[in-house]
């Protein structure tokens, strides 16, 4: 057994078994207590849908904290420059993201607001956010919250094989809108204004919707990192200032 990597600051680890070429993702107990991840047994319906729609490789929940994952490797290098320099590749990528919305929404009832509440309730550090939960809910509900979203799209979670995109690591899937997944990709990959305009054009999702969710991506990033790092961490402090400004200006 070869350990490939730790995920999410140590709440899971990924291993490869050489004898059967399978990947195993093993979760620690803090994944469900500290980081509020969904119990694996509830992932089965999602994984079935993903495999049926050819959005991801085959996953099997084989124990309370263990997932067996079919091994697949990219057969071509993928980076942001290459993605945006090829209209065909970018459209293919965006079409595959759009297919995520075809997943039966009954696989989950968890929305972004529930994710925010998990991090802020009973946490004195986030009382300012918690007091604005109702306003945040209204802000989110400007767009329908009825599509399954990956919730953590970045190049590290994307594989391209035989010109098909596969999305991995669905730990943060939620009900939201197509624009949220595009915003999260733009946020995590630090896309330029021109690149965001391009994904809006090809995806036919308005710039307004994508930009609407960018501060929500920043808020979630802050809440997650504040669990991982101390309050005086420079990244956390900078994010907090931006989150405070968003709350004061928009809620």
Task: Report the location of each language-model feature.
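An alpha-helical support segment within catalytic cores of ATP-dependent transferases
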Residues: 102-151, 239-242, 249-250
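A conserved alpha-helical element in kinase catalytic cores
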Residues: 10-11, 23-62, 67, 78-96
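Active-site activation/catalytic loop segments of kinase-like enzymes and analogous catalytic loops
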Residues: 179-206, 215-234, 238-246
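Hydrophobic residues embedded in beta-strands of well-ordered beta-sheets
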Residues: 2, 22-23, 66-67, 164-165
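Active-site acidic catalytic loop and adjacent metal/ATP-binding pocket
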Residues: 13-17, 136-180
